[in-house]
Amino acid sequence: MRGKFIRRKTPLIVFEGIDGAGSTTQTDLLFKYLKSKNHRVIKTCEPTDGPIGKLIRRALKHELKFSWQTLQLMYSADRADHLDKLILPAVNAGKIVISDRYFFSTLAYGELNLDGKWLRELCKNFPMPSVTFLIDTPVSVAMERMESSRGSKELYERKNFLDKVRKNYLKQAKEFSFYVLDGTKTKSEIAKEVLEILKKKKFI
């Protein structure tokens, strides 16, 4: 599966990883750094805070129940709205966009319960990000982080499930040329690697 890349002066930067890997932390750190350097930048995430994204978040917290297929259709609808209303207008306006998760999450998580070909068909028209960072974190480390920061587990937060998700992400890393970062390093060490890569690619 190969969607069109976003080719603009400013990039779409994506962070991926299993729950507890640190993608949200790295999104926040990069956003703060770029703001401090007076870059025009926005940060966002999936699921979004839009109407569909809010329903997905309720499902993840076990407040609503949908079939796996329905949930992935909702993710795709949320993403399409996300691209149309925020990501593409921002990139076209010359702003750097940093997203905590993108369609790679659909493939990594969704393929455990649904047909991979069907999921890829859902995702095939979504544009490729300019660069994707996979924070590869052992499940035991991620689970420990989540247990210390959250009171209850979300829908996908089970060890055997996350082990498989991690393997799916590593397969995607080869297919989509992710930059794979060691999630056991400190957050500052990872952030430094991210900046080095972005500067080398002349995105910042």
Name every feature range the model reports, one short phrase each.
Residues 101, 106-167:
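A glycine- and Lys/Arg-enriched "phosphate-lid" helix/loop adjacent to the NTP-binding pocket
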Residues 15:
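Hydrophobic anchor at the beta1->P-loop junction of P-loop NTPases
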Residues 23:
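Conserved lysine of the Walker
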Residues 20:
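Walker A (P-loop) phosphate-binding loop of P-loop NTPases
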Residues 26:
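Hydrophobic positions on the alpha1 helix immediately C-terminal to the Walker A/P-loop
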Residues 39-124:
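ATP-dependent small-molecule kinase phosphotransfer cores
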Residues 12:
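Walker A (P-loop) ATP-phosphate-binding motif of ABC ATPase nucleotide-binding domains
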Residues 2-8, 31, 140-204:
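NTP-dependent small-molecule kinase module
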